[in-house]
Curated annotation (Swiss-Prot):
It comes from Aliarcobacter butzleri (strain RM4018). The gene is rlmH. Keywords: Cytoplasm, Methyltransferase, rRNA processing, S-adenosyl-L-methionine, Transferase. Its EC number is 2.1.1.177. It is found in: Cytoplasm. This is Ribosomal RNA large subunit methyltransferase H. The lineage of its organism: Bacteria, Pseudomonadati, Campylobacterota, Epsilonproteobacteria, Campylobacterales.
Length: 151
């Protein structure tokens, strides 16, 4: 199984990255998990113009990556518990998670995804969302493989 996490974010090295890398390492027994931070010139320019332009730039950046089973993280997405989250990624060859930028996603992009979920009703920094997401991926893989971490 391959799991990709795509985030509209400038790459930085910080304590969050250490935690994310640790969850990726622990997950490697069950799946190949990779995080891809994307912040290109098109996105940077669009974010100085406004919301619609930014959402369009996010869509244009992400749409070529839509393959396998695609899950968008969106504030208006379905709230799921850990078991439902685990079911979303169970028995999939490739899963792609898409984290939007500051302005969220266009409705058209969300409609192209297989699932749209929310990690929480709380607003989180992108790095915090990545920590939560990588932990939930590891927890889900443990559930699927009867590993005691979840208990």
């Amino acid at each position: 199984m391959k799991i990709n996490i795509y985030a509209i974010l400038k790459p930085t090295a910080d304590n969050f990255d250490q935690i994310i890398k640790e969850f990726i390492k622990m997950s490697s027994k069950y799946a190949k998990v990779e995080v891809h931070y994307i912040f290109n010139k098109n996105i940077a320019k669009a974010q100085t113009i406004g919301e619609k332009e930014s959402q369009l730039a996010y869509s244009q950046t992400y749409e070529p990556l839509l393959k396998g089973y695609n899950i968008a993280l969106d504030v208006l997405g379905k709230r799921v518990d850990t078991y439902a989250f685990s079911s979303l990624i169970d028995n999939k060859n490739e899963v792609n998670f898409f984290i939007g930028g500051a302005y969220g996603f266009q409705r058209e992009f969300l409609n192209k995804c297989d699932s749209v979920i929310s990690l929480s009703d709380l607003t989180m920094a992108h790095k915090v969302a990545n920590v939560v997401l990588t932990e939930q991926i590891f927890r889900s893989l443990c559930i699927q493989n009867n590993h005691p971490y979840h208990k």
